[in-house]
Amino acid sequence: NFNFSVIEKNFDSNTSKFKLNNRIKKFKMTSNEFFMTNSMKYDLIFVDGDHSSNQVKIDITNSWKILNKGGYLILDDYMWWFYKDLKKNPASSINNFIVNNISEISSLKIWQQVIIKRNIYLYFYFIQSIILK
């Protein structure tokens, strides 16, 4: 069992210096509630939510829609210990997302967390290839 109040206090302590100048904002709600009400775009999104493969897929897809080009998407618990079946593990949805969106990814780091940088040059390369033909 997890003591979420301790986890939240640690998060608040670790991010407190960024809250002073409004560089970070914590949203305390389900990701589905957040995506239904959010209208902003972000340079950095850190996803550490429901670890079921289906919800991870939804969270990644929704996060990608609001991630600025050149922004970073960080996905926690790549190989979640609770799910021994890879199809149920977050890694399954993360791997599928990477394969399906590789042309929009300029940098990728995988360990316990996955760090994806969204490509800012996708449209430039497309336009350049049309002009040069």
Language model segments and positions:
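S-adenosylmethionine/decaboxylated-SAM
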Residues: 1-133
